[in-house]
Regions:
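Lipid interaction determinants
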Residues: 2-142
Length: 142
């Protein structure tokens, strides 16, 4: 009887291990990994809607890097998530001038450059809030 029980117990334990590896942990739902599009930005108490004809995107990669486009210029850097905080490294960006979008571009890049910001996720929306709580960037999952 013991010889039959041991293989069954081993098989059961192995099955549980394999199935638990396939289930999702709750952490994935709070990860910014993915592609996002700008919705609003600026003053937290009265954010400005994103310019309608300017697609601003940010793509957070699971390797700790991110990049995107602020309509005219492309940018990239690294980031680290710790709880509800994201720390961004120095941004590398192209530096073209495009009339009419400089406020949006400078505000978005300003909150992402060499800073730690808090973030929250609600459904398919990611909100980045400056350390002083005065500035926000709100993004929608693309």
């Amino acid at each position: 009887m013991k010889k039959t029980s041991l293989p069954l117990v081993t098989l059961f334990a192995l099955s549980v291990l394999i199935l638990s590896a396939c289930t999702s942990s709750g952490a994935a739902s709070t990860s910014p990994v993915g592609e996002w599009t700008l919705v609003t930005y600026g003053d937290a108490s009265n954010p400005t809607p994103a310019l309608p004809d300017v697609e601003t995107t940010i793509n957070f990669n699971d390797d700790g890097t991110f990049g995107g486009s602020v309509g005219c210029n492309s940018f990239g850097s690294d980031y680290k998530v710790d709880g509800d905080q994201i720390t961004f490294g120095s941004i590398v960006s192209t530096m073209m001038f495009c009339e009419g979008i400089s406020d949006q571009e400078s505000t978005v890049l300003g909150i992402l450059t060499d800073k730690t910001v808090s973030f929250s996720m609600n459904d398919d929306q990611l909100t980045l809030t400056s350390e002083d709580g005065n500035s926000v960037v709100v993004l929608a999952r693309k």
